[in-house]
Regions:
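Enriched for short, Lys/Arg-rich terminal
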Residues: 2, 16-17, 24, 28, ...
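Flexible interhelical turns and helix-capping residues at alpha-helix boundaries
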Residues: 15, 19, 38-41
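Short aromatic/basic micro-patch
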Residues: 5-6, 57
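A broad, low-specificity signal marking well-ordered, structured residues that form hydrophobic/aromatic
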Residues: 5, 46, 77
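A short, surface-exposed loop/turn module that caps and links secondary-structure elements
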Residues: 32-57
Length: 99
């Protein structure tokens, strides 16, 4: 059974900073990678150490999608942030977050 994808309200402002091409790449990756087994660690998905953003990360080249999964019967993946990573800093919207 597939997971439902939900976006936090703040993600809309994160998408505005990305190019149209990057938005399409991110949305395609979210659909392909997170609708089935979002809690399975793969080459592109990994659980994160405790941080201020989210418990899971989806890597798409230099782009990052941070998300959490609501277990149980709801089966919902909630995308909390989308940004671009450069070394140990992620730019989310217009804000830089140090990881």
């Amino acid at each position: 059974m597939a997971y439902k994808i939900e976006f936090a309200e703040s993600v809309q402002s994160h998408f505005r900073v990305l190019t149209v091409r990057d938005r399409a790449i991110v949305l395609d990756a979210i659909t392909r990678q997170l609708t089935r087994e979002p809690l399975k660690e793969t080459r592109h998905r990994k659980p994160l150490r405790p941080n201020p953003i989210a418990p899971w990360e989806l890597r798409i080249g230099p782009l990052r999608v941070f998300y959490e999964v609501a277990g149980g019967e709801t089966r919902v993946v909630r995308v909390l942030a989308v940004g671009r990573k450069s070394r140990n800093t992620v730019t989310i919207g217009r804000r830089e977050v140090r990881l």
